[in-house]
């Protein structure tokens, strides 16, 4: 990978590249440098990230420069993070996770799905949750069900609910809001 450029990565295709990156650890990824990681990531699609799995995606995410990661855009970030679980997210810097969430839109959160959104949200503290604001939290939580909210715990759910207003709750929809309330203590 160190001797390849973006054209070479494109010639490999996303599937082969995903398999290659899956077999690298975080130190190997860091040794490649930010520019190479960005080129590799831009070449991969949702299928390649699925081949990599959540742990390898987390390693890729934490070794990439924060600005470059956000520069990939919400769609790419959603395809990456939908393969991550709460334990994968916990290996990342909370500020990085917050910035990733800020870069995503409602369609990106829908792509991630409730389990990945819950994993992302479970790593955020009160400051991060309030920093996102009610509208962004509504975009995230409308993709979650009662089981997803259970991962968060009552205190985190309380922080989220305190940040949201009636319009945000309406945007969530009844099913998601019911799952949220069910898991409050």
Where are these regions (language model features)?
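Thr-biased low-complexity repeat/linker tracts and other Thr-enriched repetitive architectures
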Residues: 2-31, 35-58, 62-71, 75-78, ...
């Amino acid at each position: 990978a160190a001797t390849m450029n973006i054209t070479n990565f494109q010639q490999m295709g996303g599937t082969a590249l995903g398999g290659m990156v899956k077999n690298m650890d975080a130190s190997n990824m860091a040794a490649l440098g930010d520019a190479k990681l960005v080129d590799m990531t831009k070449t991969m699609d949702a299928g390649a990230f699925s081949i990599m799995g959540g742990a390898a995606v987390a390693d890729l995410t934490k070794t990439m420069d924060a600005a470059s990661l956000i520069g990939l855009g919400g769609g790419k970030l959603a395809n990456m993070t939908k393969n991550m679980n709460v334990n994968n997210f916990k290996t990342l810097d909370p500020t990085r996770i917050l910035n990733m969430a800020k870069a995503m839109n409602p369609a990106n959160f829908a792509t991630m799905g409730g389990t990945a959104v819950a994993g992302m949200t479970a790593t955020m503290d009160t400051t991060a949750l309030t920093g996102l604001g009610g509208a962004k939290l509504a975009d995230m939580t409308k993709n979650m069900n009662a089981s997803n909210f259970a991962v968060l715990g009552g205190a985190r759910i309380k922080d989220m609910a305190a940040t949201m207003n009636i319009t945000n709750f309406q945007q969530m929809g009844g099913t998601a809001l019911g799952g949220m309330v069910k898991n409050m203590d």
